[in-house]
Amino acid sequence: MCDMIKPSFIPGLEIRQLRDLMRYRTKLTNMKTSEKNRALNCLTVSNLKLDDVFSDVFGKSSTSIIQYLLEHPGESFDVRPFIHARCKTPVEEIQAAVEGAISVPQAIKLRQCLNHINEIEKHREEINLEIQALAEPFSPVLELLRTIPGLDTQPITAIAILSEIGPDMSVFPTSKHFISWAGCCPRNDRSARRTKSTRISRAGQSLKPLLVQIANALLRSKEHPEFKNRYRRIKANRGHKKAIIAICKMLLTAIWNVLSKVEPYSAKGYLEPKPAK
């Protein structure tokens, strides 16, 4: 078509394979979360308030108590042998939290939920090994990505980003092109000098949730004030959602610069210099 139609960006085969496994891993994680919520519902219906006394209902202490409740329904017992030494909740509060009684139908449902959670976790571990193997050839790129704030907390985070964007930033002439491709720039719906919508586009359906998750975690940390300062400034005038998208754009700009220049992240250069007006 004489270069009249711009081609779509399609990453290489290795990245597409990595992306497929990473998205499947995300679905497994969502399935695991759903099963945990169902298990918590069983406990709540049975008046077993373990979520009030344990920060993680599926931790060692809480899980051992749940297993005993399933194996000995309706039996009163002392919770002391099941409590881990590091548990800070008073024993009396934990004892009061297990005074409820679980019915047979709820016990069946809870047991199935716990078994399903364990099965999903096994599948996730197998997928993680395959993901690590596929990501091995991209180790230099991943090392650069992990210099960016928010991508250095867990190794899998940088792999997830890489699987969505690929290692080659030359396909995006500028960081603005990259941000637009990721779906983090406002649309320009205008007609007769009237602006109909400035909402962000629907592109990046898998990338944007990941960026928002990283941005929220980054804002909770005590480091990297350049992100927090920008978030607070925008939130004060335009609200939380627009401020979070602004942080996502900062992350995308940092990613584009790091991969384009093949240089580690620097707080001084996370944004391109703006041209003088």
Question: Which sequence ranges carry the predicted segments?
Answer:
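A detector of single, family-specific signature residues
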Residues: 1-277
